[in-house]
Amino acid sequence: MAAAQRTPVFELHIRPMFRLLDRAHMTTLVTPPIDMWDLDAVWAHRDEILTRLRGSGSLNMPGERVGGPWPAEWITLFERWLATGSDAVPGHHLVLSTPDGPYKVQALAGTRRRLSATVTAPSDGCRVWFALDGVSSGQRDYTLYLEPAFPAQPDDPTPLQAVDPFDKGDAAKLVIRDATGTHDVPVG
């Protein structure tokens, strides 16, 4: 028996298919400009984008001279994502989450550490995690995401753990973005 297909998520599956070049072209060469990395902009222009993805010649996006067109299965994935939304609500996407308490950094063996937070999800079927956004000298940058259940489930607040094990390296702090803002968390 084949496994059920994963519901496409804008930030995980759709946005990464739009390269920096695609974004630059669509924000400078198209009127009105479309920011291909912005959920609301892509949703507002979804029909035009799909027409361009299916198009040929100068209507094709991305153009043949710049690495296009998309493979058919990418277009199918975009269409599957479109089916997860409505005129009122954009397709399936992540939301910034809020931890129930402070972020915790636990020392493990040697230089290993574990970042964790508890999040109360609105229903069963949700997922939470820390997305690693960047690593620079002295810090690691994260975003705390919640993926809502799809299809939506009845309200049933459920505590979930977001965890990221990591090697401390030279990191003195973690910078975590969540629904309440940006937080500096010291690494012990």
Where are these regions (language model features)?
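Aromatic- and Gly/Pro-enriched helix-to-coil junctions and flexible linker segments
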Residues: 1-92
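Residues at beta-strand starts and edge strands
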Residues: 8, 111-115, 138-140, 156-158, ...
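Transition segment at domain starts
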Residues: 91-120
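Glycine-centered tight beta-turn/hairpin loop motif at sheet-sheet or coil-to-beta transitions
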Residues: 100, 123, 178-181
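Intrinsically disordered, low-complexity linker/tail regions enriched in polar/charged residues
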Residues: 101, 149-150, 187-188
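Mature extracytoplasmic domains of secretory-pathway proteins
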Residues: 111-151
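An anionic, turn-rich surface loop/hairpin at beta-sheet edges
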Residues: 140-170
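A short amphipathic beta-strand at an alpha->beta junction
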Residues: 158-188
